[in-house]
Amino acid sequence: MEPGFWHEKWQQQLIGFHQQDINPFLVKYWQTLALPADAKVFVPLCGKSLDMCFLAEQGHQVIGCELNELAVQQFFEENQLPMNQSAEGEHQHYQTEQVSLYQGDIFTLPQSITAQVNGFYDRAALIAWPESMRTQYAKQLAQLLPSGSVGLLVTLDYPQETLSGPPFAVSPTWVETHLSDDFEIQALACQDVLADNPRFVKKEVPWLNEAVYLLRRK
């Protein structure tokens, strides 16, 4: 997935991956992490997700990383949040009281930015990568997260041959095989969400499972 792919999606507003509501798994399971209210929470490939507003409402300091400039600007505009912008190395830093977004490549994000995070939340990042690049992303995420940090991972799984991603299918087996070296993994829930996703129904995908995992960085 080249950067130009995502820039084009945002430019044309072909952003079906953007959810208009807060993710139900986030609302239901976030408190199981037992993070302090003032915890710092990292959100990779954050887009303009409303989930960040939910995290900020819990009292957390949200640190996001997003490739596309338009996505970051729309987050602050649509939520009517005043922000300051500054250059920080290769990234542009957009900051408001509880949300700091770094616009740029997650693979060049300095580890110092996430060195103090307590938690993390990945809903649309892992599933954005084809299998050929997914392990590289997972290793980068692990490198950015301090030992002991806890978070939620939300995945989608379906017969990959029935639809070209993104989002790409990520099975429980893939999660266990490729993340267990760096994370303790606890599966929390899994449900069929096919009826809520017309694109998958139209393509006659037989099933679509959304799963949520609790991850703890080793």
Curated annotation (Swiss-Prot):
Annotated localization: Cytoplasm
Biological process terms in GO annotation: methylation; response to metal ion
InterPro entries: SAM-dependent_MTases_sf, Thiopur_S-MeTfrase_Se/Te_detox, Thiopurine_S-MeTrfase, TPMT
One annotated Gene Ontology cellular component of this protein: cytoplasm
Keyword Methyltransferase found: yes
Keyword Protease included in the entry's annotation: no
Signal peptide range in chain numbering: none
Binding site for S-adenosyl-L-methionine: W10, L45, E66, R123
Highest taxon listed in the record's lineage: Bacteria
GO MF annotations, alphabetized: thiopurine S-methyltransferase activity
A Pfam entry, by short name: TPMT
Reaction(s) catalysed (UniProt annotation): S-adenosyl-L-methionine + a thiopurine = S-adenosyl-L-homocysteine + a thiopurine S-methylether
SUPFAM superfamilies: S-adenosyl-L-methionine-dependent methyltransferases (SSF53335)
Keywords, alphabetical: Cytoplasm, Methyltransferase, S-adenosyl-L-methionine, Transferase
PROSITE patterns: SAM_MT_TPMT
EC number(s) per entry: 2.1.1.67
Family recorded in the similarity comment: Belongs to the class I-like SAM-binding methyltransferase superfamily. TPMT family.
NCBIfam families cross-referenced by the UniProt entry: PRK13255.1, TMPT_Se_Te
Name of the protein described by the UniProt record: Thiopurine S-methyltransferase
Lineage, highest ranks first: Bacteria, Pseudomonadati, Pseudomonadota, Gammaproteobacteria, Alteromonadales
The gene coding this protein: tpm
